[in-house]
Amino acid sequence: MIGVCLGKKGASGKLIQSTGEFALNIVGEELKEAALRCGSCSGRDVNKAEMFSIPLEAASEIAPKIVSGSRVVFECRLTDMKEVTDHIFYIAEITACSGDDSVKQLFAWDGYARLDTADA
């Protein structure tokens, strides 16, 4: 099981609710700038993968695509949702997990002010 908490008004939560599936992608340093820019606009208004050149590929167990070259990808199927103030906590079963140990994953530093690898 895994959980993610998303704002009630966001496009990602609406997609999860409509499909019942999502992928949690832990991306690597090659997508650092794209990951930062993704927070500057809504997926409701633009295709972020196209706009920020994020490579996608088919998932093995779910319909939504996954980010190619990620450190870790969790393919998830929604099992429950809980309202938490102005957010919704999505609880899911992990249906598949894949990854690449050679990819240096990004971490959020200073809140979300900076994304970087742990050794930077």
What is the predicted function of each stretch?
Residues 1-120:
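Basic, polyanion-binding surface patches
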